[in-house]
Swiss-Prot record:
Family: In the N-terminal section; belongs to the methyltransferase superfamily. tRNA (mnm(5)s(2)U34)-methyltransferase family. In the C-terminal section; belongs to the DAO family.
Pfam family, one: DAO
Region (FAD-dependent cmnm(5)s(2)U34 oxidoreductase): 254-635
UniProt key word Cytoplasm: yes
UniProt-recorded name of the protein: tRNA 5-methylaminomethyl-2-thiouridine biosynthesis bifunctional protein MnmC
BP GO annotations: methylation; tRNA wobble base modification
Subcellular location: Cytoplasm
Biological role stated in the UniProt entry: Catalyzes the last two steps in the biosynthesis of 5-methylaminomethyl-2-thiouridine (mnm(5)s(2)U) at the wobble position (U34) in tRNA. Catalyzes the FAD-dependent demodification of cmnm(5)s(2)U34 to nm(5)s(2)U34, followed by the transfer of a methyl group from S-adenosyl-L-methionine to nm(5)s(2)U34, to form mnm(5)s(2)U34.
Gene Ontology CC, one term: cytoplasm
Chief location: cytoplasm
Residues covered by region (tRNA (mnm(5)s(2)U34)-methyltransferase): 1-227
């Protein structure tokens, strides 16, 4: 449930829980005076590659929108603006948009924020704007707890929230200590509150504080700088600090599929010069060449780690698709996905059961209309994933690789990687082809070649092959089939309609053949795969299976076939991070997506880039830890 708010006669939003307004009718002017000017912005970020703002109370997003507008208007702006904001009680997207009606210049930005402001369950949510150059990371939960957990580094701090009289926990010394732990020496802080307890708390935490004249009707504001008289004790992070020295440079990415393209795009947006070495004659020649596939969140009664990761992944995938320039309906669609629990077990968290429940914007019990559209009985156990959909991964790969900072180099199978001495005492990596020629050289290499990543990873990386075969055909060849209007997953999955050529294609599968690497599969194995896929469809969508049977197993049937080898780890989670930071500096990995590459690859690319650049993480730190290479035992 979103936080209910009231509206005062002057049109400003008011929170009945705290008995305080979010901002006054002069809110935009106050935001600029108190927070931007108080932190020396936009001047302070001039010439910087990245700027990180931390805010303690998001409210209706006014300070974020004002900062974004200042970034857009500044020709000396940083390439990347991070805005991290805490919010325990998020308002609805519609109320957020309504609150900006008096600030016309912000309304286009507010509409963009409104479009992404959904599904804000407790935890961390990354929203992306301006092609990924403005990143809003929302910490939904208690500010003190979230800051202690995430430990983002801030260049500027907006200390904001409801009055200390009505919300003292947000201003107490414990929260201020959590804020201070996120500051570097020289970080500037600004707030509208001049309460004595706030001034004393900031001073106690190492800030030099001064009271300055305010913009009427405010008499005074506070400005501060983190400059403790002591040397701050280093915080022990949950994840090791592996940021690269010197900022963006050049990097080689081995692999031209979804993982490699996601990493390449994330780094290129940050100013890296990226060269993708791909053994294929064209991008996405391996497992990412799937004709079409489903992306959807995972659900579990305890809202497991994988469930939380998958939601972050779906959000990142949608952001990539929306920014890609691809055609919705032809190349992808966020049409929703029906999940049929063929074993009849209930897997949705109990608190998510109602339409108004906290998780309903993500997943909820399927209604009668959805079940009827899929040809399933009304008593079927099934869920509707409102933010799921389908995509044609090869087209997304090509769109990602089109960034001007990326050079794709095909027919470039890497046979050997070697560290070499570079000028200035640095170490570079050289990639050699099978004939011994140097394909490319760079200070950093990211291995993102799926199962082909094995030669570059130590033996302690337990990755295994997982061959998958799908069946596909054109809708025109099966006019009698009872097609659902949306993808369905569960035991296998079906994309009923992808693209428009020839009426569109359908795709179903996939097999999970552990240990199998032979490509293409033998004819007998292909026939067995078609039979296995048809058997899954019989359980998943019995009505459709009956109508589609002639195209799969009827006389003269010749269903389309596609196969590839995926890569998976024993815990079914990808590896994202340095391969061996102590002994192989500059070598990174982003691989082992398993069967969830469409859902997780974009998130993993952003996570790797964030770790390489020392940025706020796009996920909860415990989720990042679960994906990290540091989870592996040392040699």
């Amino acid at each position: 449930m979103s936080e209910p708010i009231d509206w005062l006669p002057d049109g400003t939003p008011f929170n009945p829980r705290f008995g305080d307004r979010y901002h006054s009718h002069t809110g935009l002017a106050q935001a600029r005076e108190v927070f931007l000017r108080g932190c020396g912005l936009p001047g302070a970020w001039a010439g910087q590659a990245m700027w990180r703002v931390l805010e303690t109370g998001f409210g209706c997003g006014l300070n974020f929108l004002a900062t974004w507008a200042a970034w857009r208007a500044d020709p000396a702006r940083p390439r990347l603006l991070h805005f991290v904001s805490c919010e325990a009680f998020p308002v609805s997207a519609d109320d957020l948009l309504r609150s900006m009606q008096g600030h016309g210049e912000l309304e286009p930005l507010a509409r963009a924020l409104h479009a992404q402001y959904w599904g804000l369950l407790p935890g961390v949510h990354r929203l992306a704007f301006e092609g990924g150059q403005v990143l809003l990371t929302l910490y939904i939960g208690d500010a003190q707890a979230m800051l202690r957990q995430q430990q983002p580094v801030a260049d500027a701090v907006y200390l904001d929230g409801f009055s200390p009289q009505v919300n003292p926990e947000l201003w107490d010394v414990h929260t201020l200590k959590a804020v201070a732990r996120c500051c570097r020496r020289g970080t500037r802080l600004a707030t509208w509150s001049v309460a004595g307890a706030v001034r004393e708390g900031l001073a106690q935490c190492g800030f030099r504080v001064q009271k300055v004249p305010g913009l009427p009707p405010k008499r005074s504001n506070l400005q501060a700088e983190f400059d403790p008289a002591w040397e701050p004790r280093p915080v022990q992070p949950e994840l090791p600090d592996v940021r690269v020295a010197g900022g963006p440079s050049s990097v080689l990415v081995i692999g031209g599929g979804l993982s490699g393209a996601a990493v390449a795009a994330s780094l290129a947006r940050r100013g890296w010069q990226v060269r993708v070495l791909d053994q294929g004659a064209e991008p996405a020649a391996g497992a990412s060449g799937l004709p079409a596939g489903v992306f959807a969140p995972h659900v579990s009664p305890d809202d497991s780690l994988l469930s939380r990761l998958s939601r972050c992944g779906v959000r990142a995938t949608l952001q990539a698709l929306e920014a890609s320039g691809l055609s919705e309906g032809e190349d992808w669609s966020a049409c929703g996905v029906l999940e049929h629990e063929v074993d009849g077990k209930h897997r949705l968290p109990p608190a998510w059961a109602g339409d108004a429940a906290v998780g309903a914007e993500w997943s909820r019990p399927a209604d009668a209309a959805a079940l009827e559209a899929a040809g399933l009985p009304g008593a079927t156990v099934a869920y509707w994933h409102a933010r799921g959909g389908w995509l044609r991964p090869a087209r997304l790969v090509r769109a990602l690789l089109a960034h001007p900072g990326i050079h794709w180099q095909g027919r470039s199978a890497v046979a050997r990687l070697e560290p070499v001495a570079a000028p200035g005492g640095a170490t570079h990596w050289q990639a050699y082809g099978s004939d011994g020629t140097v394909l490319a050289e760079a200070p950093h290499v990211v291995v993102a070649a799926g199962y082909g990543s094995r030669p570059w990873l130590p033996a302690r990386y337990p990755i295994h092959p997982l061959r998958g075969q799908v069946s596909w055909g054109t809708r025109a060849d099966s006019p009698a089939a009872a097609w659902p209007p949306f993808p369905v997953n569960g035991h296998g999955n079906l994309v009923p309609h992808a693209g428009t050529a020839g009426g569109g294609i359908w795709v179903m599968g996939s097999t999970f053949e552990r240990g199998q690497t032979e490509l293409p599969p033998a004819p007998q194995e292909q026939a067995q795969a078609h039979a296995a896929n048809a058997a899954k469809l019989e359980q998943l969508l019995p009505a459709l299976a009956q109508g589609l049977a002639p195209a799969i197993a009827g006389p003269g049937a010749a269903p389309g076939h596609w196969a590839a080898v995926r890569c998976t780890a024993p815990d079914r989670l990808p590896f994202v991070g340095p391969v061996d930071a102590a002994r192989q500096a500059g070598l990174w990995v982003c691989a082992a997506m398993g069967a969830r590459g469409l859902t997780l690859s974009q998130l993993c690319g952003e996570l790797l880039a964030a770790r390489m650049m020392g940025e706020p993480l796009p996920v909860e730190v415990r989720l990042a830890r679960a994906l990290s290479t540091e989870r592996l035992p040392a040699d």
